Swiss-Prot record:
Annotated function: Phosphoinositide phosphatase which catalyzes the hydrolysis of phosphatidylinositol-3,5-bisphosphate (PtdIns(3,5)P2). Can also catalyze the hydrolysis of phosphatidylinositol 3-phosphate (PtdIns(3)P) and phosphatidylinositol 4-phosphate (PtdIns(4)P). Required for normal cell morphogenesis, cell wall synthesis, and actin organization.
Name of this protein: Phosphatidylinositol-3-phosphatase SAC1
Record localization: Vacuole membrane; Golgi apparatus
GO cellular component: Golgi apparatus; vacuolar membrane
Catalytic reaction equation(s): a 1,2-diacyl-sn-glycero-3-phospho-(1D-myo-inositol-3-phosphate) + H2O = a 1,2-diacyl-sn-glycero-3-phospho-(1D-myo-inositol) + phosphate; a 1,2-diacyl-sn-glycero-3-phospho-(1D-myo-inositol-3,5-bisphosphate) + H2O = a 1,2-diacyl-sn-glycero-3-phospho-(1D-myo-inositol-3-phosphate) + phosphate; a 1,2-diacyl-sn-glycero-3-phospho-(1D-myo-inositol 4-phosphate) + H2O = a 1,2-diacyl-sn-glycero-3-phospho-(1D-myo-inositol) + phosphate
Pfam families according to UniProt: Syja_N
PANTHER family: POLYPHOSPHOINOSITIDE PHOSPHATASE
Length: 912
């Protein structure tokens, strides 16, 4: 039956506060959200018919098409049933038969925005979607297709609607590709962290004023006229990735959500530093969620941790140049009181609470000062702010020269960053739901950084000083090991008196930055995520220890997620995928292939920053509403700079930050209904007949079994990051005859094998060697003995003779007097082991087949072909742009030069 508008509007707000999705709309008719729409048109109006997921309740939105430059929207106050909406559409068709009747336009999944340029209004509609994840039973969607439709009828539009200026604005707005890295949810506030959603109450609808809602400006005309948010979608820009894992049969999901701020948003060289409102460029919040969907339970456990990245909060810039891939860095303005920097950190305290930990990864020493200029000024700014802040608001500043440490042979970047991450997590904590019944928790629980953690804070400051002085790797990691032992004892005592089932909350955040906040920052955020994941699994009872082996399969799965996130964020801000050498080395990829790919990324990023970022920045300013076209004013593309669009009092005032509140302050009425949906509800939910590709993402076949520790017995297929040689590099070298029958010294081979056997006898695993900060000799040895790759490869895959024969690799260099060799030789003397004893013809045929399948240098030839293809692509880009460097002219005379340099001069025949 039909229902009045007043009750419907209030009940939708109630539903939004509940957050828990309704499973039976018939028993709870007031709890619904509009998820599916159909757009119809007549000559005078658009009719947007929206329904809930189960198509039991329908609403109608009427959009007038008779005004060329006005937007007149009226919402029908009636809630219709399926029969009633069908009857209504028939009556509309009958009433408009004289003017063409009622025509179906498109199937729609929501309104992404409503834009006006010079005259006409346009509707931006989502016409195709796909589900990319699920948080606490709430579906998360990405956009596959979108469509822009003109609101006024073509017969009443003036010539302005078809002018060049109007068409160019329309094309510019359409260049913002909603199908890339935009996501939304109908029922879950994905723009807020899990902790914020749990602690929030009393909010009506989706918080469109949140800084991470990118279409806040575009949806404002519809939201203001309807006084609700049921017709529009709150789009978040960034990255979303979710995987389902299983540890010994216990299923859970790990979700990575990156949210890009719409304030001071833009491209790499056009948006740097901070603006007058304290907004920084490339401001991205990253949340890591772990949800335990254990079957049979009413409510599972959940945990999340938040970190963020952002440009250095100073007034600095770089100008893109066609002649310099690394432009000089300029400090545009000297602010003696660092007012904008102060506003930025106050905003972080408002968003995340205290403490704010700043991890600065830029260089300290350079031949030509670039990054070090910012490093000194940033340190001065933090020092000044700490002198005027109260002690509880002091910034924790850590500076570490990432590049300087990574260049050393014995560098273990992830180990150092992991130690810093552990310190940061001790100070900020993380969110854990605890037992579902325990919901009464006072705000005093949130004061994590009090007297009990002051020793850790002092160690953190001392550690920052050590890193800034550039201590050796052994000294730094030795200090980390000693402090880690002390932390373990303190943590054990703390855990004995702590109720592990009680809810925990995060207060404070780790803020990481380099110059671009892309490449180095992503490695540091992965190290933080890995340390946090161990604590999350431990809190949820999925692990016995709060640490995860860096060589484990679950660490590899998490690394893939952060690598995917880093590539997406780098593409948005920098124009290419992220530069990275740590992840490929850890994943065992061949160094030469990695170098060629990094080279192409540099070319692509250079091209994007030099030639396409200007138009991309204009599209962002138009989409976010920082520029609003007006008659008689200069067009967007005629402006010399967009600086005035983002200064105080113009751009940011469009979006008041009412919805941005500290996640560290609990409110009354905690949203206890926000919890994972039990697995049995997913198993028996009704699903329509659809394609296999869509269903496979939600079935159990997508669950990946992982381990919390490394599986050394299953190598070489596993990770070999601690051995000093990549698996695919070892495979290529082992296939070469020089490695199988080359001139390796017997004493070197025996010593290498013996060293591997000694480790096996002592029970020392590769993981323990990585965690042994005090002894890095094994790292330096692996670098010095590059010629013994074959023997070190065998030492990994072989077992000790004293441990038995199963799984052992018996080769020709074994001692003939050993018990195992005699046992093996005895089996070889059996008649069944001599297949060619009486058949010489079969023996010759078999030998010929072996010769045909002999592995030769074909792999090197394939690598040469791949390198030539990469270089040809680079040459094509350079020739199209006319920017081929002078020093690259000799490439044209020898196309194989790049491949020869990467693979080796002695392995590639020169082209004569």
């Amino acid at each position: 039956m039909a229902k009045s508008e007043n009750s419907t509007t209030s009940t939708f707000s109630s539903f939004a506060n509940k957050i828990q999705p309704s499973n039976d709309a018939e028993s709870d008719p007031d709890s619904y959200a509009l998820e599916k729409f159909k757009l119809y048109e007549t000559r005078a109006r658009f009719y947007l018919v929206g329904s809930d997921r189960n198509k039991r309740f329908f609403r109608v939105l009427k959009i007038d098409r008779s005004e060329p430059s006005e937007l007149n929207i009226s919402e029908d106050p009636v809630v219709y049933s399926p029969q009633e909406i069908k009857s209504l559409l028939q009556r509309i068709a009958e009433g408009n038969r004289a003017t063409g009747g009622l025509a179906f336009v498109a199937k729609v999944y929501g309104i992404a925005g409503c834009a006006k340029f010079m005259e006409s209004y346009y509707l931006v509609l989502v016409t195709k979607r796909r589900q990319i994840g699920c948080i606490c039973g709430h579906a998360i969607y990405a956009i596959d297709e979108s469509q822009m439709i003109s609101v006024p009828h073509a017969t009443i539009q003036s010539d302005v609607a078809n002018s060049k200026t109007e068409l160019r604005y329309k094309k510019l707005l359409s260049s913002v590709d909603l199908t890339k890295d935009f996501f939304y949810s109908y029922t879950y506030p994905i723009m807020q962290s899990l902790q914020k959603n749990v602690l929030s109450s009393g909010e009506e609808g989706m918080p469109y004023d949140n800084i991470f809602v990118w279409n806040s400006y575009l949806t404002q005309p519809i939201r203001s006229r309807c006084n609700n948010t049921i017709w529009t979608l709150a789009l978040v820009h960034g990255h979303f990735k979710q995987i389902r894992l299983s540890i010994y049969g216990r299923d859970f999901s790990v979700t990575l959500v990156s949210r890009r701020s719409r304030h001071f948003a833009g491209t790499r060289y056009l948006k740097r530093g901070v603006n007058d409102r304290g907004r920084v460029a490339n401001d991205v919040e990253t949340e890591q969620l772990v949800l335990d969907d254990e079957a049979g339970s009413c409510k599972g456990k959940m945990s999340s941790v938040v970190q963020m990245r952002g440009s250095i909060p100073l007034f600095w810039s770089q100008e893109a140049s066609r002649f310099s891939p690394k432009p000089d860095i300029f400090l545009q303005r000297y602010d003696p009181t660092y007012e904008s920097t102060k506003m930025h950190f106050e905003d972080l305290v408002n968003r995340y609470g205290n403490p704010i930990i700043v991890l600065n990864l830029i260089k300290t020493v350079e031949k030509r000062p670039r990054e070090m200029v910012l490093r000194r000024e940033f340190a001065n700014a933090v020092g000044y702010l700490n002198s005027i802040f109260r002690e509880e608001n002091h910034l924790k500043f850590i500076h570490w020269d990432f590049h300087k440490f990574a260049k050393s042979k014995s560098a273990n970047v992830l180990a150092v960053l992991g130690a810093v991450a552990s310190e940061a997590l001790d100070l900020t904590g993380l969110y854990f739901s605890g037992k579902p019944k325990i919901v009464k928790k006072k705000a005093s629980q949130l004061s994590h950084a009090n007297t009990a953690r002051e020793p850790s804070l002092r160690d953190l400051r001392a550690y920052s000083a050590e890193l800034s002085r550039g201590e050796s790797a052994n000294d730094i990691l030795s200090a980390l090991a000693n402090r880690e032992k002390e932390m373990k004892l303190t943590q054990q005592k703390k855990d004995e008196g702590t109720n592990s089932s009680a809810p925990r909350y995060q207060s404070g955040v780790l803020r990481t930055n380099c110059i671009d906040c892309l490449d180095r920052t992503n490695v540091a955020q992965y190290a933080y995520g890995l340390a946090a994941l161990g604590r999350q699994l431990h809190a949820m009872g999925l692990s016995d220890t709060p640490k995860i082996d860096p060589d484990s399969s679950i660490a590899a799965a998490l690394m893939d997620m952060y690598q995917s996130m880093g590539d997406a964020l780098a593409q948005q801000y920098g124009g290419s995928a992220a530069h990275n050498t740590v992840f490929p080395e850890r994943q065992g990829k061949w160094k030469a292939t990695t170098q060629s790919r990094e080279f192409l990324k540099s070319i692509k990023r250079y091209y994007s920053n030099t030639y396409t970022d200007g138009e991309k920045q204009d599209a962002i300013n138009l989409f976010l509403g920082y520029f609003q076209p007006q008659e008689g004013k200069p067009a967007l593309w005629e402006l010399d700079s967009d600086y005035y669009l983002h200064v105080s009092g113009i751009g940011d005032d469009i979006f008041p930050d009412i919805g941005v509140q500290s996640i560290a302050k609990p409110m009354s009425g905690i949203g206890v209904n926000l919890a994972p949906v039990p697995a049995f509800r997913d198993d028996f939910s009704r699903k329509k007949l659809t394609s296999f590709d869509k269903l496979i993402e939600q079935t159990c076949s997508s669950i990946k079994n992982v381990r919390l520790c490394s599986e050394t017995d299953q190598r070489p297929g596993g990770n070999t990051g601690s051995t000093g040689v990549a698996p695919d590099a070892a495979e290529i070298q082992l296939k070469s005859p020089n490695w199988l029958f080359g001139s390796r010294k017997p004493e070197e081979s025996s010593s290498a094998t013996k060293s591997g056997a000694d480790d096996s006898e002592k029970g020392v695993t590769s993981t323990e060697r990585v965690n042994d900060f005090c002894n890095l000799d094994w790292l330096s040895k692996s670098d010095r003995h590059q010629g013994d790759i074959f023997q070190r490869y065998l030492s990994i895959t072989s077992t000790n003779e004293a441990n038995g024969w199963y799984g052992g690799t018996l080769l020709g260099d074994q001692d003939e007097n050993s018990e195992i060799y005699r046992h093996y030789a005895q089996f070889c003397q059996c008649p069944a082991m001599e297949p060619f004893e009486n058949d010489h013809e079969f023996e010759q045929n078999f030998a010929e087949v072996l010769r045909m399948n002999t592995i030769d240098v074909m792999d090197i030839e394939e690598e040469e072909t791949e390198m030539e293809s990469d270089f040809n692509e680079y040459t094509q880009i350079g020739s199209d742009l006319g920017i081929i460097p002078m020093q690259c002219k000799h490439f044209a005379s020898d196309p194989c030069w790049l491949a020869r340099w990467l693979v080796g001069d002695d392995k590639v025949p020169k082209v004569i």
